């Protein structure tokens, strides 16, 4: 297996809902007019609390500097596990549970914080640039580590870090944060970038203006329904995560879906904003899922984390995570 260190240097930022009008010009340019920018990595996720933006340095320049933009204090690098060579677009998707044991747990054991972004195409593991020597040292026994430089994949240099390493103990990692599962059913999909102009107006409405149109058939007091929408445009590939009500607004022939038309339920992790320094949160969730062989997407945002699991598995997942939660007491 290969671990690719991509060349994007990323910023992770948050914008409050009420401040988003200050940023829509730049965000629309990044999402819909990418040929007019040098940005190659852009992701925007709306949650009930805020908008999380993950963007490379070139794309970050498109956003106005403002007190309303909270930026995480670090430059982040994206790692990508590739099975069978080739770029992330052509390789088989691995799924966050498949990398739980090989990537996520070892990094948690070394107290290296990660920020996850699963897309339709692949899973990106974001690590702080300053942690990279520790990351490569930790994972070098499991992976051939390659670095993308000017679009070419080359062997990553071994930075020879040895001090500061602890022999990982096989620790139990109980789930320590509150969990909730909204009532929404989600799909993870994509569309051909050539068809983006055909749905640009609709996408802009969904992203910035519609404020989450609820299913008119749903009961008016569906308090379990949350606002969640994620759009990523990374190296020319689009990924969309949206609930079924939002999906129904799109022409059905434009969205790619899995042949099974699988729907996903969400586990939301966190009662208070999680911050960026705590290690092991992704591992706490992904390890029990991996043990049960349940596929999952995982999307970290500025304040909370989100795991998506197949709809039919949600009750079992919640039970397994609650058992893990009980173990901390």
Swiss-Prot record:
InterPro entries under this entry?
ACT-like_dom_sf, CASTOR1_ACT-like, CASTOR1_N, CASTOR_ACT_dom, CASTOR_fam, CASTOR_mTORC1
Q: Which SUPFAM superfamilies match?
A: ACT-like (SSF55021)
Nucleus in keyword set: no
Q: Which UniProt keywords apply?
A: Cytoplasm
Gene3D superfamilies hit by this protein: VC0802-like
One GO cellular component assignment for this chain's record is:
cytosol
Q: Where is the ACT domain?
A: 72-140, 262-322
Q: Name one GO biological process term.
A: negative regulation of TORC1 signaling
At the top level, the lineage of the source is Eukaryota
Subcellular location(s): the record lists: Cytoplasm, Cytosol
Q: Which Pfam families does the annotation name?
A: ACT_7, CASTOR1_ACT-like, Castor1_N
Tissue expression remark: Widely expressed.
> Which GO molecular function annotations are given, in alphabetical order?
identical protein binding
Family statement drawn from the similarity comment of this UniProt entry: Belongs to the GATS family.
- Protein's job: Functions as a negative regulator of the TORC1 signaling pathway through the GATOR complex. As part of homodimers or heterodimers with CASTOR1, directly binds and inhibits the GATOR subcomplex GATOR2 and thereby mTORC1. Does not directly bind arginine, but binding of arginine to CASTOR1 disrupts the interaction of CASTOR2-containing heterodimers with GATOR2 which can in turn activate mTORC1 and the TORC1 signaling pathway.
This protein's assembly is summarised as: Forms homodimers and heterodimers with CASTOR1. Interacts with the GATOR2 complex which is composed of MIOS, SEC13, SEH1L, WDR24 and WDR59; the interaction is not regulated by arginine.
Write down what this protein is called.
Cytosolic arginine sensor for mTORC1 subunit 2
Species the sequence originates in: Homo sapiens (Human)
Q: What is the lineage of its organism?
A: Eukaryota, Metazoa, Chordata, Craniata, Vertebrata
């Amino acid at each position: 297996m290969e671990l690719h260190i991509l060349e994007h240097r990323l910023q992770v930022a948050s914008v409050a809902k009420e401040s988003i009008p200050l940023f829509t010009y730049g965000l629309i340019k990044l999402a819909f007019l990418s040929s007019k920018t040098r940005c190659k990595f852009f992701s925007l996720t709306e949650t009930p609390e805020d908008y999380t933006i993950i963007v490379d340095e070139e794309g970050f320049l498109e956003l106005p500097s403002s007190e309303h933009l909270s930026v995480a204090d670090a430059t982040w690098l994206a790692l990508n596990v590739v099975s069978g060579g080739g770029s992330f677009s052509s390789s088989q998707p691995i799924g966050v549970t498949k990398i739980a044991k090989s990537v996520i747990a070892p990094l948690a054991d070394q107290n290296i914080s990660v920020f996850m972004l699963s897309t339709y195409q692949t899973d990106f593991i974001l690590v702080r640039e300053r942690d990279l020597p520790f990351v490569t040292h930790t994972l070098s026994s499991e992976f051939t580590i390659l670095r993308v430089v000017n679009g070419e994949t080359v062997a990553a240099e071994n930075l020879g870090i040895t001090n500061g390493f602890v022999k990982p103990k096989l620790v139990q990692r109980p789930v320590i944060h509150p969990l909730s599962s909204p009532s929404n059913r989600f799909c993870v999909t994509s569309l051909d970038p050539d068809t983006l102009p055909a749905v640009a107006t609709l996408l802009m409405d969904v992203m910035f203006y519609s404020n989450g149109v609820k299913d008119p058939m749903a009961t008016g007091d569906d308090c379990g329904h949350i606002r969640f929408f994620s759009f990523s445009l990374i190296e020319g590939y689009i990924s969309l995560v949206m609930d079924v009500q939002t999906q129904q607004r799109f022409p059905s022939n434009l969205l790619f879906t899995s042949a099974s038309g699988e729907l996903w339920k969400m586990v939301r992790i966190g009662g208070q904003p999680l911050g960026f320094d705590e290690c092991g949160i992704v591992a706490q969730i992904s390890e029990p899922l991996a043990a049960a062989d349940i596929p999952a997407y995982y999307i970290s945002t500025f304040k909370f984390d989100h795991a998506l699991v197949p709809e039919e598995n949600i009750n079992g997942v919640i039970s397994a995570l609650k058992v893990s939660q009980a173990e901390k007491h």
